[in-house]
Every structure is written in C-alpha cells, then in structure tokens.
Amino acid sequence: MKGTPSFGKMNKSHTHIRCRRCGRNAYNVSKHYCAACGFGRTKKIRRYSWQNKKVNGVRIR
C-alpha cells in the first residue's frame, strides 16, 4: 500500500528514545543523534542560553 493510507502508519514507532548521555527523550533513532545534547553528532555538549528554564519561568545559566 502506498500514498495516503500509509501516512497513518508513520506514528507507530518512536522517533526519539532516551539519550544515554543527557537522559532526555531526544535521541533520534533514524538519524542517530540527540536533538537535546548533540550526542552522536559532536563531542561537545550542545548548549544554548535560551535552552533551560526553571519551573517558575526564570532562565538558569
């Protein structure tokens, strides 16, 4: 089967699994890298100033 009926089967498997470096559910299984920390793509941990937020809404450094 191809076309529109096949698109409904694309949400069965998990796109992201738990990353073994940062522990977040952001490791892309098909692309073999973590969207959160960059594991599998770079040795340096991917980190930006806008990335982390505390519960009360304040950014942490």
Swiss-Prot record:
SUPFAM superfamilies: Zn-binding ribosomal proteins (SSF57829). Belongs to the eukaryotic ribosomal protein eL37 family. Zn(2+) binds at C19, C22, C34, C37. GO terms for biological process: translation. It holds the Pfam family Ribosomal_L37e. Binds 1 zinc ion per subunit. Binds to the 23S rRNA. GO terms for cellular component: cytosolic large ribosomal subunit. This is Large ribosomal subunit protein eL37. It comes from the Archaea. A zinc finger (C4-type) spans 19-37. Keywords: Metal-binding, Ribonucleoprotein, Ribosomal protein, RNA-binding, rRNA-binding, Zinc, Zinc-finger. Gene3D superfamilies: 2.20.25.30. The gene is rpl37e. InterPro entries: Ribosomal_eL37 (IPR001569), Ribosomal_eL37/eL43 (IPR011331), Ribosomal_eL37_CS (IPR018267), Ribosomal_zn-bd (IPR011332). Its cofactor is Zn(2+). One of its GO terms (molecular function) is rRNA binding.
